[in-house]
Design a protein with these regions (language model features):
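Acidic/polar low-complexity segments with low predicted structural confidence
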Residues: 1-73
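Von Willebrand factor
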Residues: 29, 68-128, 144, 151-156, ...
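Well-ordered alpha-helical segments embedded in enzymatic catalytic cores
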Residues: 62-63, 97, 153-156, 211-214
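Short small-residue beta-strand/loop micro-motif enriched in glycine and branched aliphatics
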Residues: 85-87, 137, 185
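Short, basic/glycine-rich phosphate-binding loops at helix/coil junctions
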Residues: 132-136
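A glycine-rich helix N-cap at a beta->alpha junction
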Residues: 138-147
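Von Willebrand factor type A / integrin I
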Residues: 159-171, 185, 189-277
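Catalytic metal-binding/acid-base residues of hydrolase active sites
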Residues: 182
Length: 277
């Protein structure tokens, strides 16, 4: 549920905070009722022009505003690793899962967004929407290959989710990260505040990991946010990076070496259901 002073179902009256957007007439009348007789007598004894001809005397201290509530949907943000040899498989699986969730999300008011990351920066390919047509159209132009700017993707997911929450249509945000947790592009390069590394130059792995963990912690600390990490690493010996990201964000982790849309959709629905419970 989302509470506000201007949209939704009237659930109770409250003392106004600043400008009154929706006047609670019933509560205002009740608050003024005990004072009607003395106010009327005062007006008769010392007439004031602003109260002339009034039968009911309302003063500023009586005013109550409405507190409104409405059902809010969730926003599911798919953050998909579009770099490397398995990029196309991951993107196709995420695309199928997103469309599947949208088909079932009409009554729940849920929205989806998709942020692929490759090259030097992430990109909001599909902004928050409930439109299946828009999602299909946007997903027709998917770039794959190149670097892995995961920290930038998570920071963009955080920004996208917070903006959606401010709109008043979204309550909970589930970030579904599909990848192996590896990153090789520093955040300052993605943001354009530093030059890309020279060809053949390798970034500091520990610095990249620390930056990634800090970004995940920040995402996990945002009210109403939850991270679902789907680890697609298929190596015999795991690096454990995806698990570290999930732990840093206090999120959920699943090993998913064989990426498929049905598994992604099922796990995502479970995460959304857990947040709403």
């Amino acid at each position: 549920m989302i509470f506000s002073e201007d949209r939704g179902r009237y659930i109770k009256a409250q003392l106004p905070r600043g400008k009154v957007r929706r006047l609670a007439v019933d509560a205002t009348m009740r608050a003024s009722a005990p004072y009607q007789k003395p106010r009327r007598e005062r007006q008769q004894a010392n007439p004031q022009k602003k109260y002339m001809g009034r039968k009911v005397f309302i003063e500023e201290s009586d005013v109550r505003s409405k507190r409104m509530a409405r059902k809010a949907g969730s926003l599911i943000i798919f953050v998909v690793d579009a770099s490397g040899s398995m990029a196309l498989n991951r993107m196709q699986a995420a695309k199928g899962a997103a469309l599947s969730l949208l088909t079932e999300a009409y009554q729940s008011r849920d929205q989806i967004s998709l942020i692929p990351f490759q090259g030097d920066a992430a990109d909001v390919l599909v902004p928050p929407t409930r439109s299946i047509a828009l999602t299909k159209k946007r997903l027709e132009t998917m770039a794959c290959g190149g670097g892995s700017p995961l920290a930038h993707a998570l920071s963009m997911a955080a920004r996208t989710g917070m903006n959606a929450q401010k709109s008043g249509d979204v309550g909970k945000v589930v970030v579904v990260c599909i990848g192996d947790g590896r990153a090789n592009v520093p955040l300052d390069v993605s943001l354009g505040t530093a030059e890309p590394l020279e060809p053949g130059t390798k970034p500091d792995r520990q610095a990249l990991k620390d930056e990634l963990i800090d970004t995940a912690k920040q995402l996990g600390s945002i009210p109403g946010f939850s991270l679902l990490m789907l680890d697609t690493e298929n190596k015999f010996v795991s690096t454990g990076l995806a698990k570290d990201i999930a732990d840093a964000a206090q999120g959920r982790y699943f090993k998913l070496p064989k990426t498929n849309e049905a598994a992604i959709a099922e796990l995502t629905q479970g995460a959304v259901g857990a947040m709403k419970a």
